[in-house]
Amino acid sequence: MNVKDVSQKSEQKMKKAIEAFQHEIASIRTGKATTALLDRVKVEAYGQTMPLRQVGNVGVSDIHTLLVQVWDKSMVAATEKAIRDANLGLNPAAEGQSIRVSIPPLTEERRKEFVKLTRKFGEDSKVSLRNHRRDMIQEIEKLEKEKAISEDDRNRGKKDADDLLHRFEKQVNELIAQKEKEIMEV
């Protein structure tokens, strides 16, 4: 194993951390309807708890409305209750075998809460990135102790680790700014 291998492995881990962050912020409400809003909703179905996507189809009806097509008519009430109880501030209304979820406009206070939540997720993501950088540096130092790489390679590896961290932290900051803009948009 050399510095390049360690660097590539760490870069893959950092990319996964960014993907996880993107997935987390996708479920934060903005003023618009997106199917990701209901990703975390769990429904009590058939004696177990399952994700909403396993009991129905979620789609966007218009900019302020989601439409959930429940596959089993007996699950409509449980699905409606799960959406209401998910603490997302949504108003589901059953219509036959489907549920119309109207997305009310966000209050200024609620927008600020969502911005804080976005920043918290961003900070958690940065901590994860820093941990991957630390692991990369430890692996490089271990290789140097085993005489598998030279001191120059170690220094280059540490610089690579710092460069990777800065690149991915910049990406997190850009994603945070973009999400904040979406949230604060009226």
From Swiss-Prot:
Record family assignment: Belongs to the RRF family.
Gene Ontology molecular functions: ribosomal large subunit binding
Subcellular location: Cytoplasm
Any Pfam family the entry gives: RRF
Organism, scientific name: Chlorobium luteolum (strain DSM 273 / BCRC 81028 / 2530)
InterPro entries: Ribosome_recyc_fac (IPR002661), Ribosome_recyc_fac_dom (IPR023584), RRF_sf (IPR036191)
GO biological process, one term: translational termination
This protein's UniProt keywords: Cytoplasm, Protein biosynthesis
UniProt superkingdom: Bacteria
Name of this protein: Ribosome-recycling factor
Record keyword Protein biosynthesis present: yes
Function: Responsible for the release of ribosomes from messenger RNA at the termination of protein biosynthesis. May increase the efficiency of translation by recycling ribosomes from one round of translation to another.
Keyword Zinc: no
Any one annotated GO CC term: cytoplasm
HAMAP family to which the protein is assigned, alphabetical: RRF
